[in-house]
Amino acid sequence: MLKFISWNVNGLRACYDKGFVDVFHRLEADFFCLQETKMQEGQLDAKFEGYHSYWNYAEKKGYSGTAIFSKVKPLSVTYGLGIEEHDHEGRVITLELESFYLITVYTPNSQEELRRLDYRMKWEDDFRAYLKKLEEKKPVIVCGDLNVAHKEIDLKNPKTNRKNAGFTDEERAKFTTLLESGFTDTFRYFYPEQEGIYSWWSYRFKAREKNAGWRIDYFLTSDSLRNKLKGAHIHTDIFGSDHCPVELTIEL
């Protein structure tokens, strides 16, 4: 049994001051994936005994960035998608393991007034193609902040957010296309009708207190792994970021 954790830490240095190390040890994951590390190399000595660590930093300081801590030494590690326009923001890390690929991703936000929506659409197509190419060789597990609430059940206030980044028809359609290409939303696999479970809450308007959240952090797996899925969990009780960790357990 393997346990995977994914957490958008909204700045790892800040999260360190809010109990990150305790959470890391308590969750005891085989693979612990981070998004929005917001740091450069050498700014934090984040090493954990028994784990190999891999970092992809954005060129812009204090922005984006991903990391993976792995108990298993991978066969290979790839940073980015291998596409120039997508590979300056530290958004993707791929580990090749014996029987699967693990990808962590911090999907670009479409931003206010949807000024980055066109770029986001291109990213979605290129990222999906990247995953499908990997899948020709081995099954894929992809986790991270995908910056989209897929269905109305995935956010507290769907009606008022229809035209907002993360819940536009365009973004939701791309997510549907990704699933239809052969991927399983593992949380919905186990809890297809569960309402009121979210992974991100705005820091404004006491959103977390009111549970006015969005489920935008996911574990997706190749459909071929469905019969190996053992559990999915969203750790809504864990603080330290505006997101909470999400979990997948799988028999591999």
Feature map (PLM): residue ranges:
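Metal-dependent phosphoesterases centered on the DNase I-like endonuclease/exonuclease/phosphatase
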Residues: H52, D126-A212, I216
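Structured beta-strand-rich core segments of catalytic domains in phosphoester-bond hydrolases
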Residues: K38, Q43-S110
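Surface-exposed cleft-lining segments at the edges of enzyme active sites
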Residues: G82-I83, P108-E124, K159-N164
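N-terminal, active-site-proximal structural segment of metallo-dependent hydrolase catalytic domains
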Residues: M1-F48, A58-S64
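Conserved beta strand-loop-helix elements of the APE1-like EEP
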Residues: K61-S76, I197, F205-N227
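Active-site-proximal beta-strand elements of phosphoester/diester hydrolases
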Residues: L2-N10, S99-Q111, C143
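Active-site beta-strand termini and strand-to-loop segments that position acidic
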Residues: K71, L95-E98, S222-D223, S241, ...
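Active-site beta-strand/loop signature of hydrolases that rely on acidic residues for catalysis
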Residues: N8, F24-G42, L102, L131-E152, ...
